[in-house]
Amino acid sequence: MPSRLRKTRKLRGHVSHGHGRIGKHRKHPGGRGNAGGLHHHRINFDKYHPGYFGKVGMRHYHLKRNQSFCPTVNLDKLWTLVSEQTRVNAAKNKTGAAPIIDVVRSGYYKVLGKGKLPKQPVIVKAKFFSRRAEEKIKGVGGACVLVA
């Protein structure tokens, strides 16, 4: 007949938990974790984990990582990078100074051309612009400013 509870549930509240008196179910006879991989567990490591120990090849000392790191933002998300107040002010006085959106400060490097911009001029600062993004920004009377 199948038991409803697992053995561990039945043993709750019993100090020895089925392992006899003090010290009978010994603590960590082979060491903890991966201990002894080069010594008493050598056979297991050699058989099932070949190449676990040791090094191969040479190190590349001056390797530049993340050279191609270039987070992008699309035009349809451009206005979400500025505050609500800036958006309202820009919509009110269309003849005044165009608002400046610095995408680098928001963590983006490149502006891509997906989506539409509202018909009001805006100055966008970024490290890179796609061709279509530049066309669309200039199409609404804005400007693209390259920053280092």
Swiss-Prot record:
Modified residues (Phosphoserine): S68
N6-acetyllysine: modified positions: K47, K55, K110
Keyword match Lyase: no
One Pfam match: Ribosomal_L27A
InterPro entries per the UniProt record, alphabetical: Rbsml_uL15_N, Ribosomal_uL15, Ribosomal_uL15/eL18, Ribosomal_uL15/eL18_sf, Ribosomal_uL15_CS
Region (Disordered): 1-39
Post-translational note: Hydroxylated on His-39 by MINA.
UniProt modified residues of type (3S)-3-hydroxyhistidine: H39
GO biological process: translation
UniProt subcellular location: Cytoplasm
Keywords, comma-separated and alphabetical: Acetylation, Cytoplasm, Hydroxylation, Phosphoprotein, Ribonucleoprotein, Ribosomal protein
GO cellular component: cytosolic large ribosomal subunit
Basic residues composition bias: residue spans: 1-30
One GO molecular-function entry: structural constituent of ribosome
Quaternary state and interactors: Component of the large ribosomal subunit.
Protein family: Belongs to the universal ribosomal protein uL15 family.
Free-text function comment from the UniProt entry: Component of the large ribosomal subunit. The ribosome is a large ribonucleoprotein complex responsible for the synthesis of proteins in the cell.
Protein name in UniProt: Large ribosomal subunit protein uL15
The species this protein was found in: Macaca fascicularis
Gene transcribed to yield this protein: RPL27A
